[in-house]
Regions:
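Aromatic-lined, polymer-binding surfaces characteristic
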Residues: 1-94, 105-132
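Short, mixed-charge aromatic SLiMs
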Residues: 2-4, 43-51, 95-107, 152-166, ...
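Terminal, non-catalytic domain-edge segments
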Residues: 133-223
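Active-site-proximal structural scaffolding
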Residues: 13, 64, 97, 124-127, ...
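Hydrophobic packing residues in well-ordered alpha-helices of helical domains and bundles
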Residues: 35, 90-97, 146-153
C-alpha cells in the first residue's frame, strides 16, 4: 500500500522509508527510492538545534519525538547495516537525536508536568519517545544520568495517569490527563492512544542495567 499511495510532503515520507527499510532488513530487498527521498527532504527541513520541520514549515509539537527522529535513526541504522549509500548520515542524525533528548529531559517540571504543544497530545507521554529511546540506546549526554531519566519519566507517568484514563474494561480513553475526548484529532482513535507505550522503551534494558539499579537522581528542573 505504501508503494501505491503517494505520501504527503511531511513526516509521512518516513513511514514509506521505514516500510522499505523493514523489507530490506527482513528480505534483503527493497525499493531504495522512498528511503533516499525521505532522507533528502528531511535534510532540507532541518531547522537547527535538534529540530526538524514537519514538512517545509516548523511546527511546535512533539512530532520530532513521535515519528521523525526515532524513525530516521532506525532507517539509517538499517542502511548502515546493509551498506546502503547515504548511511553515513547516521552519525549526524544520532547527534541530533541526542540533542533533542537532552532538551526533552529539561522539559519535565519538578512536578512531572510538561508543555502541551501542538497536535496529537492524546498520545500522552509517548511524547518522550526520543528520551526513552536514547536511554535504551545508552547514549544519553554525559551530564544526564540514566537514573534521573528513570525518575523523571516515572514522575510524568504517575502525574498523568489521572482518574478517567482507562474505561471500565481497562482500555485507554481518549485524552491527555484523564478522559478528554475533545482533545482528540480527527485521525486519532482508541488504538492511537497506545503510542504512549513508547515511554517504556527502557524496558529493553537488562534488569541489572544502571538505568534500573542506580539510586534515584534529581532531574534537571529539580536541580
Amino acid at each position: 500500500a505504501s508503494r501505491r499511495i503517494k505520501a504527503s510532503e511531511s513526516n509521512w515520507l518516513i513511514f514509506s522509508a521505514t516500510i522499505e527499510a523493514a523489507l530490506l532488513e527482513f528480505t534483503g530487498e527493497c525499493d531504495l527510492k522512498p528511503i533516499h527521498y525521505a532522507l533528502k527532504r528531511h535534510k532540507e527541513w532541518y531547522k537547527g538545534d535538534g529540530w526538524y520541520g514537519d514538512g517545509r514549515n516548523f511546527h511546535l509539537d512533539y512530532y520530532n519525538s513521535y515519528v521523525i527522529q526515532p524513525m530516521l535513526i532506525d532507517v539509517l541504522a538499517v542502511m548502515k547495516e546493509h551498506k546502503v549509500e547515504g548511511a553515513d548520515f547516521y552519525d549526524v542524525q544520532l547527534q541530533r537525536l541526542i540533542r533533542y533528548a537532552d532538551q526533552q529531559e529539561k522539559m519535565i517540571s519538578p512536578e512531572g508536568t510538561y508543555p502541551v504543544l501542538g497536535r496529537s497530545m492524546g498520545y500522552r507521554f509517548g511524547a518522550f519517545q526520543v528520551l526513552a529511546q536514547v536511554s535504551w540506546m545508552k547514549l544519553l549526554p554525559e551530564h544526564i544520568k540514566p537514573a534521573q531519566v528513570r525518575c523523571a519519566l516515572t514522575k510524568v507517568m504517575k502525574r498523568q495517569l489521572a482518574k478517567g484514563t482507562f474505561d471500565k474494561d481497562g482500555w485507554l480513553n481518549l485524552g491527555f490527563c484523564g478522559h478528554q475526548p475533545e482533545i482528540a484529532d480527527r485521525y486519532v482513535s482508541t488504538g492511537s492512544n497506545y503510542l504512549c507505550t513508547f515511554i517504556f522503551l527502557p524496558l529493553g534494558l537488562q534488569a541489572d542495567d544502571e538505568f534500573w539499579t542506580a539510586k534515584p537522581e534529581k532531574w534537571s528542573s529539580v536541580k
